[in-house]
Amino acid sequence: IKQAIWKDAMLKSDEVRIKYASKYAGSSNYWKNSIGMNKGLANLKVIERKREEEAAFAAWVAQDAKRKEVYGDVLNLLEKGYTSSSEYKKISTYLGEAFLSGAEIVKLARMIQSVDVKGSTPEEIDIFLEDNIKPFFKDYDASLDQKVLAAMMKIVKERVPAENLPDIYKKVDKKYKGDYEKYAADVFKKTSILSYDNIASMLKDPKKYAKLKKDPAAELSLSVLISLFELQQLTGDSYYDIAKGERLYFAGLKEMYPEKALSSDANFTMRVSYGSIGGYRPYDAAWYDYYTTEKGIFEKENPESDEFWVQPEILDLIRSKNFGQYANKDGELQLCFLSNNDI
């Protein structure tokens, strides 16, 4: 929804297109990556393979009384944790995508709210403004974001249970009769944070900063954050069960397969990744080679699609086949390659 709103505005205005090109590409890439991952999970039958692994683990545990004592409840613990948290996780995702990653004014308000005005030096405030606020306004269009906010408010109301909606929805229902476009227009009309100078003045004056509590954008941001915090509280026990279950399950697998090298979860860590370059079989009777060449540019190039449009000069250069030392033995220009290592 956000991408469609952005795209429409980008097609109508070169200024907006330039401002939002990178943001749109990033959002689109994230969306397409999710589609690809889900497709990969299905095609590679990952869920079926994991179920087989769990069944083998359960059978192995059942063969020994000591194993039953240590690992007997592991799979139940994991199922309980994931089942009890899945709905809350979905709701948190809606709120996060719609507000923290959707309407940019909420992100802006959150950045400002995160500043410790009284505990920061003037130099620290200046650095914050230079590193965060100035870049924000460089590629921002308030009128476009207003449309996004209205759309995000609407979809959250449609998809999130009433008891988990941020409190701001009660105000919107009462004061604006559920008219999200009217509410969004009011937020953008009355907020004081759509000006770099206003923000700078606010952050350098604790008395002005205190008035931020009454700002409609800050009110929305705080309401969303409170809801996310409440959801986090509701999933605390579930995530404890998951963490405990994963720890015991991994320990059990290491015991079950002592000769097998099992990798630990290195997510969000600094790590060196090892792998190999190679082709890929996505489905029966199909094979993807390990590299692409310039031919693929012509096969995918589409002048009617802004995502697959290629500058005519680039196409002419490729047609000349003057690749010099970069050509392979067949005279092709190898461009990309596949590997199975993490990045």
Enumerate the predicted regions with their spans.
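Terminal presequence/propeptide segments associated with secretion/organelle targeting
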Residues: 1-343
